[in-house]
Amino acid sequence: MIFDMLPNKIKKEPSKMATMVWPDFGKSFELNEFYRLYESCGGEIGKAYIFFWSTKEIVEFEPLRSELYPSAWRIFASDGGGSYFGFSDEDGKPHFFSCDPIDPTGSVYWLGEWQEFIRRLSKAEYF
């Protein structure tokens, strides 16, 4: 499964498994599938650490995200040391990135689609 490499996954209660965080991308979008099954996760992937925020944390961050970040950006995770992870839906396909929370548009690193994002994250090639 595509989430096997993600550490310390917290499974959702079966009654909450229908959540689609980003409905515009549909059920096949990797993060919608992740959040359908899991509440969050965190730990090392290769040389990097990542913490996938819970759906509650994503919703709570939304007002700040909409104020500080481009409207097409969605933030869903951090590395615990100064980088946020998100994706942009500017062209109808999700492209993942990392950015500095203090200067997000001045420090964005584009990391590709899901498989490339995970590969680059595992090698700590995201800043």
Across the structure, where does each feature detected by a protein language model lie?
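A surface-exposed partner-binding patch
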Residues: 1-86, 126
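Short acidic-glycine loop/turn motifs at beta-strand connectors
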Residues: 87-91
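Intrinsically disordered, low-complexity regulatory segments enriched in Ser/Thr/Pro
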Residues: 92-102
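Compact, glycine/acidic-enriched structural inserts
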Residues: 100-127
